[in-house]
Amino acid sequence: MAKITETFELFGKQYTLETGEMAKQAGGAVLVRQGDTMVLVTATASKEAKDADFFPLTVDFEERMYAAGKIPGGFLKREGRASEKATLTARMIDRPLRSAFADGFRNEVQVVATCLSADQHNQPDVISIMGASAALMCAGIPFEGPLAGVRIARNVDTGEYIVNPTFEEEEASDLDLIVGGSEDAIYMIEAGAQEVSEEDMLDALMFAQKALGEFCEVQKRFLQEINPTPMEIKLDEAPEFITERIFAAGKEKMYEALHNADKHARMDDVAAVKAELKELFTEEEQAQYGKYI
């Protein structure tokens, strides 16, 4: 694949998406850049589905000392274990991505974001969400993208919202809001603030949703240049007669159970409904389709 680069400016800051030059053995690889902060995000999926009742997705965020122009101290001169910040960043990338994969997709997927350069001004975490989304789509993995992530700060003096603020802008802000999602839906919210009103928080979320749409639109243009080949998969879906039988007999009961305000009573009610629905199936059906029931 030839090198493809998409450089754009949004909300007063310049970004770059690039693929085709690094990590060519990965299913999809995108270098995302804001200022001089650069993160390489790779996405790879197994060819065969795993025999499991869950989606085996692994997301990792790798911090490297060389990104800040440093060499690890100590005798071995080796990188240490992942920091708490790296672990939290990996989880932040995982949350919006996980819900965007096709139902019944059981192939193992690995997303690795490696910070190659940290310019001490722009933060690498939220742009990694956009990089992960672009890498997954470049790999042709069944993923309902594009998705993006934005950090919203607010200028205390003017009241203006700032998209993906620098460290300096964030320190002077009374709001630190991270939002992940698509152009028309929010998938993840993480926030900290100094007594920001509910009205201001809702305004910030609406502003974040508009910003997400802008970043998703750029990814669409980027993907058109790449034109990836969709991955051939076989979804692990429950037989239709099972879903019809469960929905017909248990939809209303489960709805009532889930709306019980008492936590322990709610858990008991949900367990009782599940046990009742399980009795709808014969022993032979339970043995054959147990993971769907």
Language-model regions, residue ranges each:
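Conserved glycine-bearing catalytic or ligand-binding loops at nucleotide- and phosphate-handling centers
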Residues: 53-62, 128-131, 287-293
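Gly/Ser-rich oxyanion-binding loop with an adjacent helix/lid
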Residues: 108-163
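Structured core elements
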Residues: 5-9, 16-18, 30-33, 40-42, ...
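Extended amphipathic alpha-helical scaffolds
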Residues: 1-46, 51, 231-293
